[in-house]
Amino acid sequence: MTEEQITKGIGGLIIVRDSIESALALPRSYGVDDIPLVLTDRDFSTSNQFTMVPYGDSMLTNMTLRAQYQVPAQVVRFRILNGAIERSYNLGFSDGRSFSIITSDGGLLNAPVSVTKYILHAGERIEILVNCSGQSGTSVDLKAYNSLLAGNVAGGENFNNGPFANYLGKKDFNILHLNIGAQTANAITTIPKTLITNILLNSANANITRKLTISDSAGLPNIQGPNAFILNHKLFNINYNEYQVPLNNTEIWEITSSSAFGHPFHIHDVEFNIISVNGVAPTAAQAGWKDVVFIPGKTGGGPGNPGTPSVVKFIAKFDDYADALHPFMYHCHISLHEDEGMMGQFVVTNQNAVADLKNTDILVSLYPNPTNNKLYIEFKNQNQSAYYITITDVLGRTKVMLPKPELLNGIDVSHLSKGIYHLTIIENNSKQTTTKTFVVN
């Protein structure tokens, strides 16, 4: 249901800050010279409601039609998320100016990368710096130069009819009109030369190379387009975990795609480093920490000729546990494709730790009980903690779900109706469960 939920607005971005970024001379006056941009597109019905389609006819920036914004005549920072259902955006400015990319999905690059165009695929994030110094009283447009996209890249197609037809297909269009005003006090007017020293993963330290495939399959039911796009020759099954990854494993994932279409591949749990795309090292803007990588469509092909598959390799360290109850996922970040089954699951196991703790009892108490405000949880064994907490009512209906909860200030249950409830705790180390009953009065 991802396409439907994103269409209706359940999608956005989170800004994560740290001491290294805070020490840099970067714009950070939120809404003045530090501006988040969520890019998407929508189709409107005759009653001006969103319709659920892969491509909309109208560009929306921060959910605004024909968006414009006033920025100061200095260096301006845009934190950009491609939140579209499917479309990629070939970003550039109407006057051809350069802009500097300073982050990829997972954080700062070693140094700003100056470009005039950048293709941002579904789910990807970048931050850019644009120098507007000395330009007060002028204006410029941030545009999508999608007429330049290949026909097998989302947004580069030109469908005249059918479910994928849309006004913006294979066209250039405005994303944001910028009116440049006066410079602010304490303005940033220069772009730093260096940002951080990333320590990337070394392929020589990889424990394994996992080989994944992307392919097309025709004739499957409930598929909107002519092809179903599938991972590892199967559609998603929520009860099946494809891989068991040992905790702290460093792994190379090698994805070979015979699909005619390009797919932004996303993995949960980790940030990774791209090793190569079709044998070529990543560009400087892609050489940092990533969690989305574009897998190009195959090249060539035709009657009797399958074409040449594309091959993308990345390396990641899996340092966070995930059991079969809460597996991590990997999928195409085009929502329609993942909804139709282009997705898989994996667990990250720590067998030794689980075996050592398997017979450890979970002794826990709840207080005050009854309660009408907050419920506090105390583990008798100080080495134990909560991995997951679920609260259900007497009919078995889930009322509260708390992954890795902070318990110091208690759990707010004031919104629950009076009655009896069951609280189930999954212990963090052993992954064993215990259930306690409490009363809301």
Which residues make up each language-model segment?
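Short coil/turn motif common to extracellular beta-sandwich-like domains
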Residues: P72-V75, L247-T250, N369-Y376
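Extended terminal and domain-junction accessory segments
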Residues: E4-T40, N110-G262, D269, I274, ...
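C-terminal soluble interaction/assembly domains
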Residues: I274-T299, G304-G307, F314-K317
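Acidic-aromatic/histidine active-site loop/patch
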Residues: Y30-V75, R79-I85
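Beta-strand-rich interaction surfaces with strong enrichment in secreted/lumenal proteins
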Residues: R66-Q68, S114-Y118, Y240-Y243, K290-N305
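A glycine-anchored, Pro-Gly-centered beta-turn/N-cap motif
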Residues: Q74, N249, H326, H331, ...
